[in-house]
Structures are given as C-alpha cells and as structure tokens.
Amino acid sequence: MTTELIILVIVVLTALAFDFTNGFHDTGNAMATSIATGALKPKTAVALSASLNLVGAFLSVEVAKTVGKGLVNLDRIDISTNGADLMLIVFTGLVGGILWNVLTWLFGLPSSSSHALFGGLIGSALAAMGLNGVQWEGVVSKIVIPAVMSPVVAALVSTVGTWLVYRVASPVSDDKKTNGFRWGQVGTASLMSLAHGTNDAQKTMGVIFLALVASGTVKDDDAIPFWVKASCAIAIALGTYLGGWRIIRTLGKGIVEVDTPQGVAADGASAAIILTSSHFGMALSTTHVATGSILGTGLGRKGAEVRWGVAGRMVIAWVITLPAASAIGAITWLIGTGLNNLTNTHYVGELVVFLILLAFSIWMWRHSQKDAVDASNVTADWNDSKNEETEKTQDETLESHRSDDQDITELPSPAREKAGA
C-alpha cells in the first residue's frame, strides 16, 4: 500500500468520523420535540430518525457540490504535483469540525455541525494558501447569509404555524388534541429526519470528494461515486442511532416546554425550510433551523415561557463556532505541515494530528460519563437539571459561610479576635 493511499484512507475515515459525530450531535434537531412531548419513546425516536437519515442521504447531491467545489479554491493548487497539500487541508479541516462538535456536545450546546465543518476547512485553507485559498463568494452566498436568515425565517414560520394550529384546534378536547397531534408529530419529525439526511450527509460527501480530487482518483467535474454516498449515509445513520442525548435534552426541554401541537408546528416548519434549501444547494445548518422553529413555538403559544438565558447561550455558541473551528483547523494544519517538513514525509503530520484528535475525543467522552444523559433521564424536568442542583449547592455553601460569620460576631471580643486570627 502506497503512502498516498494510506493518507487517503486516513482522510476518508476521518470524514466518516465527522459524519458520525454529525449524526449524534444533530439527532435532537429532528427528534427533540417528539421525545419531549412523549409522542415517541426516546430509543424508538432515534431508531426512526436513523433510518430516515439513511434514506435522505441518497435524495440529492446539490449540497455536496457546494462543499466539494464551493469553499476551497482548487485553482490555487496544482493537483498533479501538490495533491498531498490539498489532502492535508481537507484532513485538518475535518479535525477542526470533529473537535468542536464533540466539545459542544459535551456541554449540551446545539451548535452547528455544518459550520464546524466549514470553519475547519476555511481555517486550514487560510493557513495553507492565505486569503485567496477560500472562495469567499461561495462562503457568503451559500453559508453566511443562510446562517443569519435561516433561524429568523424558521422562528417566524413556526410562530405563525403554532398560532394557527392552536386556533384551528381550539374547539377540540384536550385528550383528542393530544392524541391526534402526537400522530401528526411522528409524521413531521420523520420528515425532518429525512431532511436532515438529505442536507447533512451530503456535506461529508463533498469533503470526501475533495480528498478524492486531491489524490487524483477523480476529477473535480466528475460525479460523486456511489460508494461515497452509501458510506456517508451509513455513518450519519449510525451516529443518529446512538442519540446525542445531551443536545436532545437542551432542545426538547431547555428552550421552551413543548406540547404536541407546538411540536408539529416546529418540525413541519424545519422540514419545509431544509428540504427547500437543499434543492437549491444551500448548506443550511439544521441546528439553526430547528432551534429557530422551537423558539417560534414558544412565541406563538399564548402563555408559553421562553428561557431566553438558554437561547442566548446557544446564540453565542453559534457565533463562535465558525471562528473557533477555523482556529482549530489552522492550528492542526500548522502542526501537520510542520511535522511533515521536519521529517521530510507526507504522513507523519497526519498521523500525529490523528492521534491528537483521538486523545481529545476519548478524554471528552470519559469526562461526559461523570454527568451522563441518556434515554432514561433525557425528558426529566429542566428545573431538576444539573445547573439548578449546582446553584442550590452554591446557595447552601454561602448560607453556611454566613452562619459561621454570624457565630463569630456573637463571640465575646477577645474570642472574636482569636477566631479572626
């Protein structure tokens, strides 16, 4: 096996690893509301979502073309002589996306897997080729503008949809309303899962296509091979089946308490927007769309409580995702190319960066087990969450300190001076 082939295998496996993290990181986008309302049991929900992600990955390749040909300026690299350089750009870009995905999953923050990937690729391309290494027109038109507009549009559509749903269903009894909308929610959540597979699996297809172009296996105007589509579909389905319970909990319980009519409105709005954007090749963040839709259900239902503090932390995560992943991509590219130059090889840097990725991922997974979220506690009341328990512990500690201070002040003066000493 040649060195070039070994590097290609490492890059493809890393791309599929990103696709896997995309699956478990973004499961909540499709199934959080269905799980929160009880329309589907947690494990049933992720199994259904995984199946539909698998199917959705085969429906279109327009987003894959955007990623494969619309971010990195291939004209800046002579593939025939510098294919290894492009391979390193793709590889370290993937590392940036994976590390940011796993980190935000650890904190239960539904940040954008798409923007983590794009940020990693942009950062590594900038480090390797400077400003001219990125196709900025494609970045702005296909990524930045949709990123700003999609959550706003989703929130508006979901707000109107929620208001209409409650208005139309107002004469119906609560029991019939709940049962009927639960079945409706299964349908809209399934459509959302299909949309997620259609949109997100394609992004990894585009990255693998870039790696194949770099290796000289295909030309940049060739069609995406079937094995690439199939492997990406399977990887995202497996990741989805594991269920990103931390993020499912944040989306389903953290922003707003969702009832079944709200779930139907949110999932329906998200699916419609994502499927439409996929048709036009826009690499939307399903996280931004789903979060905007869930927020809209809180605005559209009279008396619903929106937890703006949670929403604010999520927006901060959205804003820093692109630059943070870019920084990781650039740093890992510098490490990789520095080691390759030092050893006069084209693989030592990739191997070391891969080991760094593996070590950090294992550490973050082990750390997550200290406060595990799974199918058994994903729907627990948000008021019983770790944050409230932490605040209670802090309050008890402060009260204990106040009690100690009060005891000291009640001592006679000499004893008080001794206690203060």
Whereabouts are the PLM-identified features?
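Multi-pass alpha-helical transmembrane bundle typical of ion/small-solute transporters
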Residues: M1-A421
